[in-house]
């Protein structure tokens, strides 16, 4: 339930400057995760696209009655004036991100098949973006996801 609420707030275009929430520590770690780490995923990319997140503090289970089985974290997300990467089509960007994490153990070229693109088209856009399709999506930076999305946008113009 946490992820849909956070994403709804981030995508809402409400006039907010920052979002401060308490979430399970594992969710907070996913929100601030860097490429190539086990916690890095689509949530990391989305939160970091819209905000500059940082974990403010951890809240131990004993702080609550009854005590939950997990540690919580307070995370501050300062909304960006503009995303850190230039994207031609934001929906296409998030479609590429979703594909990149659809099957974590597969190569990016294989996970891109979930978009409905042909193998030849995938190879074409990866070449245009100068991306090695044999890498896994969880190693991609925001810029690399943007490069693939922008290459795709250019191919469908």
Identify the role of each PLM range:
Residues 1-137, 147-157:
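Class I S-adenosyl-L-methionine
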Residues 144:
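Interdomain hinge/lid region at the active-site interface
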């Amino acid at each position: 339930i946490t992820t849909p609420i956070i994403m709804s707030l981030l995508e809402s275009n409400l006039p907010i400057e920052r979002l401060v929430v308490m979430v399970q520590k594992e969710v907070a770690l996913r929100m601030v995760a860097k490429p190539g780490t086990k916690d890095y995923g689509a949530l990391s990319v989305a939160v970091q696209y819209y905000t500059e997140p940082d974990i403010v503090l951890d809240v131990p289970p004993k702080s609550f009655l009854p005590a939950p089985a997990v540690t919580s974290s307070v995370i501050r997300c300062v909304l960006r004036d503009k995303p850190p990467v230039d994207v031609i089509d934001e929906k296409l960007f998030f479609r590429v991100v979703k594909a990149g994490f659809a099957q974590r153990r597969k190569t990016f070229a294989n996970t891109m098949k979930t978009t409905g693109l042909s193998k030849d088209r995938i190879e074409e856009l990866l070449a245009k973006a100068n991306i090695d399709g044999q890498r896994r999506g969880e190693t991609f930076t925001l810029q690399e996801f943007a490069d693939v999305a922008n290459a795709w946008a250019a191919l469908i113009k």
